[in-house]
Amino acid sequence: MTDKIRTVQGRVISDKMDKSFTIAIERKVKHPLLGKFIRRTTKLHVHDENNEARLGDWVEIKECRPVSKTKSWTLVRVVEKATIA
């Protein structure tokens, strides 16, 4: 049986935890009555073994077995580093 592993990309919104961070994934959904496209955000907790991701980074994550009560995703790679102004 070949299950495709889900991977998604999002922006790091919090990196204050040790070996963990939170990302926000944005998607656009159509409003049922107005027909206008609105943005919806999903927040996920991600396991980061080496503390690679920083606040504002664009990262790719994949689904894995539960690491803790809230973490079922792990870091694949940092797609784009955040620019510090």
Swiss-Prot record:
Pfam families assigned: Ribosomal_S17
GO MF assignments: rRNA binding; structural constituent of ribosome
InterPro entries from the UniProt entry: NA-bd_OB-fold, Ribosomal_uS17, Ribosomal_uS17_bact/chlr, Ribosomal_uS17_CS
Presence of the UniProt keyword Ligase in the record: no
One GO cellular component term: cytosolic small ribosomal subunit
Paired cysteines (S-S): none
Keyword rRNA-binding (UniProt): yes
GO biological process, one term: translation
Xref: PROSITE patterns: RIBOSOMAL_S17
Keyword terms of this UniProt record: Ribonucleoprotein, Ribosomal protein, RNA-binding, rRNA-binding
Described function: One of the primary rRNA binding proteins, it binds specifically to the 5'-end of 16S ribosomal RNA.
Protein family membership: Belongs to the universal ribosomal protein uS17 family.
Subunit structure: Part of the 30S ribosomal subunit.
Name of the protein: Small ribosomal subunit protein uS17
Organism: Actinobacillus succinogenes (strain ATCC 55618 / DSM 22257 / CCUG 43843 / 130Z)
Taxonomy of the source species: Bacteria, Pseudomonadati, Pseudomonadota, Gammaproteobacteria, Pasteurellales
